[in-house]
């Protein structure tokens, strides 16, 4: 897959990014280089390789799954402009 100048300008327009002609030409080369690298990565044989979440072997810390209300409701609504008990009051926006 390769990117042409029209594609770069179209993507920039969709992203609402102002790109000059010189920048678009430079980005065309950069994006084609990136896509070439991604194509190289997709050709690597990874059969038998376990997926990793980190480059360092580690085990995630686990904690007990305990249901609790956190006892923070009053603190959470303390700075709200309007509240009733432990609920936020907001103006009606849909008729």
From Swiss-Prot:
It catalyses: L-glutamyl-tRNA(Gln) + L-glutamine + ATP + H2O = L-glutaminyl-tRNA(Gln) + L-glutamate + ADP + phosphate + H(+); L-aspartyl-tRNA(Asn) + L-glutamine + ATP + H2O = L-asparaginyl-tRNA(Asn) + L-glutamate + ADP + phosphate + 2 H(+). It holds the Pfam family GatC. Its EC number is 6.3.5.-. The keyword Secreted does not apply. PANTHER family: GLUTAMYL-TRNA(GLN) AMIDOTRANSFERASE SUBUNIT C, MITOCHONDRIAL (PTHR15004:SF0). Heterotrimer of A, B and C subunits. Belongs to the GatC family. This is Aspartyl/glutamyl-tRNA(Asn/Gln) amidotransferase subunit C. It comes from Sinorhizobium fredii (strain NBRC 101917 / NGR234).
């Amino acid at each position: 897959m390769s990117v042409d100048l029209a594609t770069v300008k179209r993507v920039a327009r969709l992203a609402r990014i102002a790109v000059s002609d010189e920048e678009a030409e430079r980005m065309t080369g950069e994006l084609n280089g990136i896509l070439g690298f991604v194509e190289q990565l997709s050709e690597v044989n990874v059969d038998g390789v376990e997926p990793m979440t980190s480059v360092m072997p580690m085990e995630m810390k686990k904690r007990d799954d305990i249901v609790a209300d956190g006892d923070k409701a009053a603190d959470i609504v303390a700075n709200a402009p309007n509240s009733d008990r432990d609920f936020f009051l907001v103006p009606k926006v849909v008729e």
